[in-house]
Amino acid sequence: MDKMRPRVVDVKEIEPNRKRGGDLRTLLTPVTVGATSGFMGLAIMRPGERISEHYHPYSEEFVYVVEGRLEVDLDGETFPLRADQGLMIPIDMRHRFRNVGDEEARMVFHLSPLAPKPSLGHVDTEAPAISDDVKAYPLVQEESGRPERPGVLS
């Protein structure tokens, strides 16, 4: 049996993913480090920026705000989040993040367990906000092993 080896991944090594809002960097993943139980990343949001509403049908999401002030909508209810606070988002709970502060916000996120396939792990429920540096993309949900929730865009 092969033994996994530790690997350090620098945030600068990871291409930004801006298609759902914010600058999402998935650092520690099955692809980057051979993770088998989940993945971890960093969300960077400019003032006024948001990450569009979505949910995870197979994973809990753990977040920790490193800097800045955020609001998170959890199944339609809004909660404040600030630096040095953490939050656990249960499986199937819709959520959206907004930077409501005057400075950049940084939030570490971890999802576990992994979905059976990457395409099943994230379900968009609204279109992303379009900014100057991101183009609109079609919201197409791939094949799913679980029923969609009402209101899911497809």
Swiss-Prot record:
It comes from the Bacteria. Keywords: Antibiotic biosynthesis. GO terms for biological process: antibiotic biosynthetic process. Residues 133-154 are annotated as: Disordered. Transmembrane segments: none annotated. It holds the Pfam family Cupin_2. Residues 143-154 have a biased composition (Basic and acidic residues). Pathway: Antibiotic biosynthesis; curamycin biosynthesis. Signal peptide: none annotated. Belongs to the SchB/CurC family. This is Polyketide synthase CurC.
